[in-house]
Amino acid sequence: MEDFQASEETAFVVDEVSSIVKEAIESAIGGNAYQHSKVNQWTTNVLEQTLSQLTKLGRPFKYIVTCVIMQKNGAGLHSASSCFWDSSTDGSCTVRWENKTMYCIVSTFGLSI
């Protein structure tokens, strides 16, 4: 049982991280319509809130968080990432959030210390 708890405390838990990211997006953007002039503020708020909440978990990780906000206008977006890490402890998750006027895509990487 102790081994399970120890591994739980040092593992990257995708569901937990996704929940934190979704809350940060809702808090920063909420029901707003896309406004180009607000995008820098929104991305900064999403990133700061996400990192703040992840840090409060007190887990032995370094975090990397990226945020893309784009207007819904029919344009496509393709991205990729590649990591060389220990898949038993490190992890990543991507959250895609949308409303009628925009997409917000947040990728979070957790690297065990």
From Swiss-Prot:
It comes from Mus musculus (Mouse). GO terms for biological process: cell division; establishment of mitotic spindle orientation; negative regulation of ERK1 and ERK2 cascade; negative regulation of neurogenesis; nervous system development; positive regulation of neuron projection development; regulation of G protein-coupled receptor signaling pathway. Keywords: Acetylation, Cell cycle, Cell division, Cytoplasm, Cytoskeleton, Dynein, Golgi apparatus, Microtubule, Mitosis, Motor protein, Neurogenesis, Phosphoprotein, Transport. This is Dynein light chain Tctex-type 1. The gene is Dynlt1. It is found in: Golgi apparatus; Cytoplasm; Cytoplasm, Cytoskeleton, Spindle. High level in testis (germ cell-specific). Expressed in sperm (at protein level). 200-fold lower in liver, brain, heart, spleen, and kidney. Levels in thymus and two embryonal carcinoma cell lines were several-fold higher than this low constitutive level. Belongs to the dynein light chain Tctex-type family. Residues 41-113 are annotated as: Interaction with GNB1. It holds the Pfam family Tctex-1. Its main location: Golgi.
